[in-house]
A protein has these predicted regions:
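Feature captures the catalytic cores and cofactor-binding loops of soluble hydro-lyases/lyases
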Residues: 192-269, 275-278
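Short, Lys/Arg-enriched charge-dense amphipathic segments
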Residues: 93-107, 185-193, 230-240
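Glycine- and Gly-Pro-enriched alpha-helical subdomains that act as flexible
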Residues: 163-215
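Intrinsically disordered, low-complexity regions enriched in acidic/Ser/Thr/Pro/Gln residues
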Residues: 1-173, 177-178, 182-184
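Short beta-strand-to-turn element immediately C-terminal to the catalytic PLP-Schiff-base lysine
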Residues: 176-177, 270-272
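Surface-exposed beta-strand edges and their flanking turn/coil or helix-capping segments
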Residues: 58-63, 73, 108-111, 136-137, ...
């Protein structure tokens, strides 16, 4: 599932407005209904960011892989809860009813699934847990970063990735200033962890200057990465991969400049192009 956005495509210092397909990212709250001591209990078990579609397969696989069930016969039914919501008119809550009562590990159901290295919000157990703790928009007057620095950012990031050079299997985030100087870089198998490490280090050591710096990330930019950047008042976030729909919508809402598909030959601007100096 995807949605089209108007995007400023930058190449050779020229801007072209094009329609760009962006993968939809939406939260799915998963609930479990089961019988305990003769009573029907309902438990929120997790929330995950997903591309809508095949949600029944998703909860089946989740229950099996977490060994909440041993086989698919233990699932009596799966149903969507509530009315379709949001911009895409989607069901974002799904509930599985199981007939398993013996040896059901309730503690496993209640634990926070924070170990998923690709999605930090997957540990949340309610849609109410996903919110942006920010009220005001970013100052649109800064930072101002030249096109040439943005184009160099993937190589600047790669040059600082010592672990990636060894393993090829790790993400990174870098804080880069307006002159193209890499202030700091942090790596992790989880892209959200890499950004947390970077912001933790730079804020703790007084290295963050939001008026003259931006953040470059490996991989795609999703909702959570943009959310983390917003909490640190980062004006520009650039990724070598594609953003998701929630990332674009969130960036637009708070006036962040969001860049995707950044490479030496060009990049896409998904929101607030005014911070980028072309030419």
């Amino acid at each position: 599932m995807d949605i089209k956005y108007n995007v400023s495509k930058i190449k050779d210092s020229k801007e072209e407005i094009v329609k760009d397909a962006v993968s939809v990212e939406e939260p799915l709250e998963m609930r479990l209904k089961y019988k305990k001591n003769g009573k029907i209990e309902t438990q929120n078990i997790s929330i995950t960011m997903r591309t809508p579609g095949n949600d029944e397969d998703l909860i089946r696989g989740f229950l099996f892989n977490e060994r909440i069930i041993e086989n698919m016969d233990e699932i009596d039914s799966i149903q969507n809860i509530g009315d379709p919501v949001g911009d895409y008119n989607l069901h974002n809550v799904i509930e599985a009813t199981i007939n398993k009562t013996d040896n059901l590990d309730i503690g496993k159901l209640k634990r926070n699934f924070v170990t998923n290295s690709s999605c930090g919000v997957c540990g949340k157990t309610s849609l109410d847990s996903i919110e942006v703790l920010k009220n005001d928009k970013l100052d649109s007057h800064f930072p101002k970063i030249k096109e040439e620095i943005i184009l160099k950012s993937p190589s600047l990031l790669m040059n600082e990735q010592s672990e990636f050079a060894k393993t090829g299997g790790i993400h990174a985030s870098a804080l880069i200033d307006e002159a193209g100087l890499v202030i700091a870089t942090r790596e992790d198998v989880g892209r959200h962890n890499a950004l947390d490490k970077l912001l933790g280090h730079t804020i703790q050591n007084g290295l963050l200057n939001i008026k003259a710096q931006f953040i470059a990330c490996s991989g795609r930019l999703n909702f959570e990465l943009v959310q983390k950047g917003l909490m640190a008042n980062i004006g520009i976030m650039a990724g070598v991969g594609a953003p998701t729909s929630l990332a674009v919508d969130l960036a637009k809402r708070f006036d962040m400049t969001l860049l995707g598909f950044v490479k030496e030959s060009g990049f896409n601007i998904y929101s607030n192009k005014d911070r980028i100096i072309l030419g």
